[in-house]
Amino acid sequence: MRLAVIAGDGIGPEVITEALKVLDAVLPGVEKTEYDLGARQYHKTGEVLPDSVLEELKGHDAILLGAIGDPSVPSGLLERGLLLRIRFELDHHINLRPARLYPGVQSPLAGNPEIDFVVVREGTEGPYTGNGGAIRVGTPHEIATEVSVNTAFGVRRAVQDAFGRAQQRRKHLTLVHKNNVLTNAGSLWWRTVQTVAAEYPDVEVAYQHVDAATIHMVTDPGRFDVIVTDNLFGDIITDLAAAVCGGIGLAASGNIDATLTHPSMFEPVHGSAPDIAGQGIADPTAAVMSVSLLLAHMAEVDAAARVDKAVAEHLATRGDEKLSTAAVGERILGKL
């Protein structure tokens, strides 16, 4: 496996260091290339992601990212110039966000209910395509528009991916949308789900408006197995899903090209946390979870299962103990 490593900003390098130790333990011999992308690269060169580096990234099998963002750089510049550019250039049309409440982790929900579902979020369409504009800016007659783009092709491949995952899990898929108001896009999504469902007769299908889904994530999260949704709704509900499972510090994500034409990218959901960077106190658990997602995507199923098991055992016995970044990494390595 040829792996591109982008440690990034803030606590990114610290958590990625521990994640790579785990990767090396379960899959020795991975060929790693490190790329210094983020605030340092921007301040040094004025570029966020040079074209030549993007071409190099395309030659790898997968990408592991730490975190991007720094207060010394204008807000959104790194995110758009690096994360979104990689997503669109490498056709990361699936954003995969597992949501699992591990034993030993305290949920804000009463009674620590059983939570184990996956959100499949379409990653390259919706209102995030930059299709919009503004006129008469700064006047009382300003008009601003953001157009949500939904194509039959894009919706179909997200729905197809979600059904495939549901087939391998508990065989239940929920479409989350708002088709009573967003009638055009909502109709396309629902008709696509119904069409693809015919290929998976043993997968039960449900629909929920996005506002109802947020309620049920809090009151009855056990009803969900696989959720499929568009880019905007997915962006919102995945953070809620992380919150009920103990917080974004325990959330991993995959930005996936399901066709395997381009390398997919895996990262912890948390940010760069510049306020604690360099102190050795950042929790690398989510970065290690990202390694598990990466391994599963690369069909290294046994290695992924070993990492999952080690993380689960670590969380089950950790309690409220405050541990350093390195100590958490050592504990997870020990569980292997």
UniProtKB/Swiss-Prot annotation:
Pathway: Amino-acid biosynthesis; L-leucine biosynthesis; L-leucine from 3-methyl-2-oxobutanoate: step 3/4
Superkingdom of the organism of origin: Bacteria
Note describing how the cofactor binds: Binds 1 Mg(2+) or Mn(2+) ion per subunit.
Alphabetical keyword list: Amino-acid biosynthesis, Branched-chain amino acid biosynthesis, Cytoplasm, Leucine biosynthesis, Magnesium, Manganese, Metal-binding, NAD, Oxidoreductase
Entry's transmembrane regions: none
Coiled coil segments of this chain: none
The keyword Oxidoreductase appears for this protein: yes
Reactions catalysed: (2R,3S)-3-isopropylmalate + NAD(+) = 4-methyl-2-oxopentanoate + CO2 + NADH
EC number, UniProt record: 1.1.1.85
Entry-linked PROSITE patterns: IDH_IMDH
GO MF annotation, one: NAD binding
GO biological process terms held by the UniProt record: L-leucine biosynthetic process
Binding site for NAD(+): G271, S272, A273, P274, D275, I276, A277, G278, Q279, G280, I281, A282, D283
Function in brief: Catalyzes the oxidation of 3-carboxy-2-hydroxy-4-methylpentanoate (3-isopropylmalate) to 3-carboxy-4-methyl-2-oxopentanoate. The product decarboxylates to 4-methyl-2 oxopentanoate.
Known partners and oligomeric status: Homodimer.
HAMAP family linked: LeuB_type2
Protein name: 3-isopropylmalate dehydrogenase
Organism annotation: Mycolicibacterium vanbaalenii (strain DSM 7251 / JCM 13017 / BCRC 16820 / KCTC 9966 / NRRL B-24157 / PYR-1) (Mycobacterium vanbaalenii)
Gene: leuB
